[in-house]
């Protein structure tokens, strides 16, 4: 087996391999860090490479922490029955991974999100690493594999649900019978697709 296959096998079931112990130590440190942190190199090299990361100028890795659970809605100031306050049982209709990608994009507005992957979780948080690309960097513009991201119609792609996590959240992995209300978009079908 090659190096990447060993890494992939270890991450398939982290608790059973050496990854579990490493994650425990890492998360103690990660909890103290800000929610969005730029890092030097990917934690899961195999996953990052599979999703398009290259170790060259113009590629940036960002680790993002997202709170687990449903959506935390703002609390009303006026009087209401507790059951009518609209505090519980509301979900954001987006995966936590998609939310993490958006957080990274807001922190680094000059970069575009390429993709992301899971790196850890505990009872309170989930961590994702987001691969970001500088569309104005000459190295990126001259690489035919990634130069497409510099085109103007890819600007703000994460906020339009065009990343892998975004497309999954919009139901675009499904086609055929049962997926009639998914395309062209959820909104075009008056929200009936979700």
UniProtKB/Swiss-Prot annotation:
<dbReference type="InterPro" id="IPR012678">
    <property type="entry name" value="Ribosomal_uL23/eL15/eS24_sf"/>
</dbReference>
<dbReference type="GO" id="GO:0003723">
    <property type="term" value="F:RNA binding"/>
</dbReference>
<dbReference type="GO" id="GO:0022625">
    <property type="term" value="C:cytosolic large ribosomal subunit"/>
</dbReference>
<feature type="region of interest" description="Disordered">
    <location>
        <begin position="164"/>
        <end position="194"/>
    </location>
</feature>
<keyword id="KW-0689">Ribosomal protein</keyword>
<dbReference type="InterPro" id="IPR024794">
    <property type="entry name" value="Rbsml_eL15_core_dom_sf"/>
</dbReference>
<dbReference type="InterPro" id="IPR000439">
    <property type="entry name" value="Ribosomal_eL15"/>
</dbReference>
<dbReference type="InterPro" id="IPR020926">
    <property type="entry name" value="Ribosomal_eL15_arc"/>
</dbReference>
<dbReference type="Pfam" id="PF00827">
    <property type="entry name" value="Ribosomal_L15e"/>
</dbReference>
<dbReference type="GO" id="GO:0003735">
    <property type="term" value="F:structural constituent of ribosome"/>
</dbReference>
<comment type="similarity">
    <text>Belongs to the eukaryotic ribosomal protein eL15 family.</text>
</comment>
<feature type="compositionally biased region" description="Basic and acidic residues">
    <location>
        <begin position="177"/>
        <end position="194"/>
    </location>
</feature>
<dbReference type="GO" id="GO:0002181">
    <property type="term" value="P:cytoplasmic translation"/>
</dbReference>
<protein>
    <recommendedName>
        <fullName>Large ribosomal subunit protein eL15</fullName>
    </recommendedName>
</protein>
<feature type="compositionally biased region" description="Basic residues">
    <location>
        <begin position="167"/>
        <end position="176"/>
    </location>
</feature>
<keyword id="KW-0687">Ribonucleoprotein</keyword>
<dbReference type="InterPro" id="IPR020925">
    <property type="entry name" value="Ribosomal_eL15_CS"/>
</dbReference>
């Amino acid at each position: 087996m090659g190096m990447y296959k060993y890494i992939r096998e270890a991450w398939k079931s982290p608790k059973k391999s050496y990854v579990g112990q490493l994650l425990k130590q890492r998360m103690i440190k990660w909890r103290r860090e800000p929610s969005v942190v730029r890092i030097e190199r990917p934690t899961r090299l195999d996953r990052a490479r599979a999703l398009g990361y290259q170790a060259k100028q113009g590629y940036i890795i960002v680790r993002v922490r997202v709170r687990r659970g449903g959506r935390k809605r703002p609390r009303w100031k006026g009087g209401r029955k507790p059951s009518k306050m609209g505090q519980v049982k509301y979900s954001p209709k987006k995966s936590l991974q998609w939310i993490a990608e958006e957080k990274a994009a807001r922190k680094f507005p000059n970069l575009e999100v390429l993709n992301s992957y899971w790196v850890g979780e505990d009872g309170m948080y989930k961590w994702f690493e987001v691969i970001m690309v500088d569309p104005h960097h000459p190295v990126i513009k001259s690489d035919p594999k990634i130069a497409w991201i510099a085109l103007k119609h890819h600007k703000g792609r994460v906020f339009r649900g065009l990343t892998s996590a975004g497309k999954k959240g919009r139901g675009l992995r499904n086609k055929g019978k049962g997926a009639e209300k998914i395309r062209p978009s959820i909104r075009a079908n008056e929200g009936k697709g979700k």
